[in-house]
């Protein structure tokens, strides 16, 4: 189930994301470092040494796509008029990932690695943690549901 965010939580969520969203390469690097099984799902990166590809153009482009997706979703959250756009984005993510054999467990691994990254790059305290937990609970509720029903 989804729990609405207060205006203060929403503002903190968005402003804190804005402080890290340009660290695309570092975010994806942290996810791959913690989860080689996720890296293995990307044909252009499978089986390659992570440190040797981190500074490549391909890695930068793909990092931008992944982090850009989160930025787009986060930008739309909080305005009920944006729900159709959010649904379209999330349904597209779910169907493209299901087609590539990505499972719920890998989304959960991604989430855990993202939180770990955030906890080291934001002013992490109980308020920040609870805000991100709530926001990601809501986002992943929709993402995992869409993954389940995707064709």
From Swiss-Prot:
Residue span, Globin domain: 4-148
GO terms, molecular function: heme binding; metal ion binding; oxygen binding; oxygen carrier activity
Keyword terms, alphabetized: Heme, Iron, Metal-binding, Oxygen transport, Transport
Entry-linked CDD domains: Mb-like
GO CC entries: extracellular region; hemoglobin complex
Keyword Metal-binding: yes
Pfam families: Globin
Family: Belongs to the globin family.
Note: There are at least 12 different components in Midge globin.
Protein name: Globin CTT-VIII
Organism of this sequence: Chironomus thummi thummi (Midge)
């Amino acid at each position: 189930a989804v729990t609405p965010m207060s205006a203060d939580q929403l503002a903190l969520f968005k402003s804190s994301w804005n402080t890290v969203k340009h660290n695309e390469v570092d975010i994806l690097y942290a996810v791959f470092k913690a989860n080689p099984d996720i890296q293995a799902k990307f044909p252009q990166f499978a089986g390659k040494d992570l440190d040797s590809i981190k500074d490549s153009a391909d890695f930068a482009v793909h990092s931008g796509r992944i982090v850009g997706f989160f930025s787009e979703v986060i930008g739309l959250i909080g305005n009920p008029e944006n729900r159709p756009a959010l649904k379209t984005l999330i349904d597209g993510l779910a169907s493209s990932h299901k087609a590539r054999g990505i499972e719920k467990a890998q989304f959960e691994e991604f989430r855990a690695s993202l939180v770990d990254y955030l906890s080291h790059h934001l002013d992490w305290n109980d308020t920040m943690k609870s805000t991100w937990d709530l926001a990601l609970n809501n986002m992943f509720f929709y993402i995992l549901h869409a993954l389940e029903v995707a064709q």
